[in-house]
């Protein structure tokens, strides 16, 4: 994606790492969509817009009815640790991916899944965000919010890493909303 080079280069740690290696940056950039033809197969690279990053794309393998979707979708598990920022921008990115014609999703950091698994993650995130917003508007502390959501979001406790990461997810969303960063 056309924004990737700037994001890659602005990271100090990345710059240090790159200074010790010969790195070839992308020489093809696109804004919204790039179509690859590989034999009789079509792969659409589609920008998901601003959110987790400004260069996040989904690879849509048209004939195989498969997408490769990284970082914004945790398939069959809760989101990683305190989640990324800004969390509210994940929802439009995920909805854009959902508009594609696919059956299988290949994530970057979770199990393979189906289209319904992406919908389930959207439901998880929207519920999490909404309930944290409600708790904050009621003046609840982070700790109170965590305890409330452990009960009110129990319908999602089937997700992997619930015990490890759910309270961290609540913490991340709470801090983003409290600090006004959830939709920046």
Language model features: what each stretch is:
Residues 1-127, 131:
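Metallo-beta-lactamase
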Residues 22, 40, 53-54, 165:
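A generic fold-level signal
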